Amino acid sequence: MSHEIFEQAKPILKKIQNKGFKAYFVGGSVRDYIMQRPIHDVDITTSATPDEIESIFDKTIPVGKEHGTINVVFQNDNYEITTFRSEDEYIDHRRPSEVYFVRDLYQDVQRRDFTMNAIAMDLNYRLYDYFNGQQDINNRVIRTVGVPSERFSEDALRIIRGLRFQSQLNFQIDSDTLHAMSSQISDIQYLSVERVVVELKKLIMGNNVKQSFEVMQNMKAFNYIPFFKSFEMSHLHIDEPITFELWIAILIVQQPKDIQLSTLKISNQEKATIKKWVTLIQTLPKIQSKQSLITLVYDYNLNDIEILLSLHHLLKQNGLTTANHLIINEISIREANEKLPIHCRKELAINGKDILNHTNKNSGPWLKDTLREIEIAVISNQIVNTKEEILEWVDAHVKI
């Protein structure tokens, strides 16, 4: 069975093969193809060295040439092509001391993390499965390639990746693999927090997050991760997928600590989102009327009903005060959203410049306050969202 994303990349494999080298699709794209899951990009592995790949293709980017990876730009798409490689002893539980380029596919896939990710596929969709990865996929089992303790000693991030796959794919972890994870969990303290957070963001949004989160708690994994080790993670209950930012916000409100978000090495946008969720969580108990709910839905752009319902559930589950269920429920949230005449300040019929021209005043803090009062008046249906009516209302109600 063909697949569009592989068909688009076939010419790359053909071009490499025409030069006398081997080339295969490998990793997550092959796994997802077997599972009939959405495929977003493909990884290609080859017997050609990075220098040879650069000589074959016109446009290349040496993103990780020293580790065997060349980015090939083909028909306006980027493809990562990595040379078959073998690795020397790992240092710091995260990177090999030396990488060797090899010409044999088996040598390459035997260094990979899990059997389901160690399957290669040629351009004719023939599979090369040396470690029974298809069988493990069919049985929904996560198992390391070879000895679990060796794989996790090479890169401790594989422990978190395994738990992330459990959450995303709803697979069970092989008992030997799980035992090695638990025995070597302290090694994740040597990882950069950025690498761990990338995996946690995916884990917390998986459909099987409840089981994976509990496994992490039982292993005391959070004791070895910056930021999280400052909290009592056993007190937190997560039984449904949520965003990373919402997870952190619930944790901060549940257990107030003087811990900087910068410890997580996340973006300023993510920090702002977390702070927004913290404020929302602290605001929810104050929602006592339909009008206050309408204002809340407007202020936080809560047009995704499921997010607010999920938050409401998680707060109750974690012993945090939230709004009365008679005020916040699916029907009331939907009604509040539908009643909003506008959904953001940009939809107001006037802007700050209009008010300045109308009042002949200089700009200042009063302008921001006035715009806020106008927003409340419009969303509470005190006035219709037209320029004329808003300016009349300003003249009559706003002290400037």
UniProtKB/Swiss-Prot annotation:
Superkingdom of this protein's organism: Bacteria
Residue sites binding Mg(2+) per the record: 41, 43
One MF term in the entry's GO annotations: tRNA binding
Binding site for ATP: 28, 31, 112, 155, 158, 161, 164
Enzyme class, spelled out: transferase
EC number: 2.7.7.72
Catalyzed reactions per annotation: a tRNA precursor + 2 CTP + ATP = a tRNA with a 3' CCA end + 3 diphosphate; a tRNA with a 3' CCA end + 2 CTP + ATP = a tRNA with a 3' CCACCA end + 3 diphosphate
Keywords: ATP-binding, Magnesium, Metal-binding, Nucleotide-binding, Nucleotidyltransferase, RNA repair, RNA-binding, Transferase, tRNA processing
Coiled coil start-end: none
Cofactor section: Mg(2+)
Swiss-Prot/TrEMBL GO biological process terms: RNA repair; tRNA 3'-terminal CCA addition
Residue sites binding CTP per the record: 28, 31, 112, 155, 158, 161, 164
Note: A single active site specifically recognizes both ATP and CTP and is responsible for their addition.
Protein family (similarity comment): Belongs to the tRNA nucleotidyltransferase/poly(A) polymerase family. Bacterial CCA-adding enzyme type 3 subfamily.
Subunit: Homodimer.
Entry function: Catalyzes the addition and repair of the essential 3'-terminal CCA sequence in tRNAs without using a nucleic acid template. Adds these three nucleotides in the order of C, C, and A to the tRNA nucleotide-73, using CTP and ATP as substrates and producing inorganic pyrophosphate. tRNA 3'-terminal CCA addition is required both for tRNA processing and repair. Also involved in tRNA surveillance by mediating tandem CCA addition to generate a CCACCA at the 3' terminus of unstable tRNAs. While stable tRNAs receive only 3'-terminal CCA, unstable tRNAs are marked with CCACCA and rapidly degraded.
Name this protein carries in UniProt: CCA-adding enzyme
Gene: cca
